[in-house]
């Protein structure tokens, strides 16, 4: 069955609120993303609960460490049946290769993707890190490393999705946060796009958090978004 292109970011600190939200939507509408704060506060209890209720889980921990540590961590996480997990592409070739190698020992391994440049960043942020190039060039560079390491795909902003898709083909997964609707608050996001243009640009999965989790009727909102996406 083809998965929904929507990943909802569970931007909660309290697992009870995440559970309450999950009961308002359906697993066929989206996958769910769990980040650092919620994972620390809930552990695998929440993941198990959501999986038992039919949801696929993207564990967004953006792992970044020495290769041996990453290999052991990915191996341990994969045993919990998560759908997708990520590492930082900036961790380097050896780290990403170690992460990929860990999954060779797992039946039905999760998708392994690499974070390129955070959607909260702009060119001046790269310059402060002594990276003097355009964001798109750095995203392509990091994506190329992930591709060579055999990862399933990358995370980038929708601004870079079209060029990443063109360079790495249709089998390379592109996950794009920074999804916002017209006339909504960008919060801490800088490189943003509406969900429909993001999919047109080549994204496989769009990550939407607050616009959906703070909606008075998230089920209906998801249905409206999916209906429009199905016509693209």
From Swiss-Prot:
Assembly, per entry: Homodimer.
Family: Belongs to the OMP decarboxylase family. Type 1 subfamily.
Classification of source organism: Bacteria, Pseudomonadati, Pseudomonadota, Gammaproteobacteria, Enterobacterales
GO BP term, example: 'de novo' UMP biosynthetic process
UniProt: substrate binding residues: 11, 33, 60-69, 119, 180, 189, 209-210
Tagged with keyword Lyase: yes
Name of the protein in its database record: Orotidine 5'-phosphate decarboxylase
Keyword NAD tagged: no
E.C. number: 4.1.1.23
Pfam families per UniProt: OMPdecase (PF00215)
GO molecular function, one term: orotidine-5'-phosphate decarboxylase activity
Any one GO cellular component localisation term in the record: cytosol
Biological or metabolic pathway of the protein: Pyrimidine metabolism; UMP biosynthesis via de novo pathway; UMP from orotate: step 2/2
Protein task: Catalyzes the decarboxylation of orotidine 5'-monophosphate (OMP) to uridine 5'-monophosphate (UMP).
Enzyme class: lyase
């Amino acid at each position: 069955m083809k998965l929904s292109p929507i990943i909802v970011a569970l931007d909660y600190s309290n697992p009870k609120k995440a559970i309450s939200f999950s009961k308002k939507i359906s697993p066929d509408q989206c996958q769910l993303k769990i980040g650092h704060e919620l994972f620390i506060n809930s552990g695998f209890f929440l993941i198990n609960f959501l999986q038992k209720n039919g949801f696929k889980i993207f564990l967004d921990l953006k792992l970044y460490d020495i290769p041996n540590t990453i290999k052991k961590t990915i191996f341990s996480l994969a045993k919990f049946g998560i759908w997708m997990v990520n590492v930082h592409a900036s961790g380097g070739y050896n780290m990403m290769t170690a992460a990929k190698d860990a999954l060779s020992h797992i039946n039905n391994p999760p998708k392994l993707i690499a974070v390129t440049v955070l959607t909260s960043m702009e060119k001046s942020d790269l310059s402060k890190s002594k990276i003097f190039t355009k964001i798109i060039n750095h995203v392509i560079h990091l994506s190329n490393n992930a591709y060579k390491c055999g990862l399933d795909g990358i995370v980038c902003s929708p601004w870079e999705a079209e060029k990443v898709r063109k360079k790495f083909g249709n089998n390379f997964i592109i996950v794009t946060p920074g999804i916002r609707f017209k006339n909504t608050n960008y919060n801490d996001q800088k490189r943003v796009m509406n969900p429909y243009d993001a999919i047109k640009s080549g994204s496989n999965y769009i990550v939407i958090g607050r616009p959906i989790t703070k909606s008075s009727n998230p089920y209906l909102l998801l249905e409206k978004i999916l209906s429009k996406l199905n016509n693209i």
